[in-house]
Amino acid sequence: MNQSEILEKVKAIVADQLSVDPEKVVPEASFAEDLNADSLDSVELIMALEEEFGVEIPDEEAEKLKTVQDVLDFINNKVAA
């Protein structure tokens, strides 16, 4: 899976989980500030990402995922490993 495929999947998951327009899901978007995600949204988003990409995102790592780019970097590192 290449980076553009990962980006498209992440955008789709974020847009679906947070009920936002996919056009708003850009790498620099903050989940809390730009996409209005609350803590429950964040938990559900992490679970959806884990399921889609077959990775485990520990709580201490999940807390660091503040933007779409943070998620992309994390997934790219896990998938490339």
From Swiss-Prot:
The modification O-(pantetheine 4'-phosphoryl)serine is found at S39. InterPro entries: ACP, ACP-like_sf, PP-bd_ACP, Ppantetheine_attach_site. It is found in: Cytoplasm. Pfam families: PP-binding (PF00550). Keywords: Cytoplasm, Fatty acid biosynthesis, Fatty acid metabolism, Lipid biosynthesis, Lipid metabolism, Phosphopantetheine, Phosphoprotein. Pathway: Lipid metabolism; fatty acid biosynthesis. Residues 4-79 form the Carrier domain. One of its GO terms (cellular component) is membrane. It comes from the Bacteria. Disulfide bonds: none annotated. One of its GO terms (molecular function) is acyl binding. GO terms for biological process: lipid A biosynthetic process. 4'-phosphopantetheine is transferred from CoA to a specific serine of apo-ACP by AcpS. This modification is essential for activity because fatty acids are bound in thioester linkage to the sulfhydryl of the prosthetic group. SUPFAM superfamilies: ACP-like (SSF47336). Carrier of the growing fatty acid chain in fatty acid biosynthesis. PANTHER family: ACYL CARRIER PROTEIN, CARRIER DOMAIN-CONTAINING PROTEIN. NCBIfam families: acyl_carrier, PRK00982.1-2, PRK00982.1-3, PRK00982.1-4, PRK00982.1-5. Belongs to the acyl carrier protein (ACP) family. This is Acyl carrier protein. The gene is acpP.
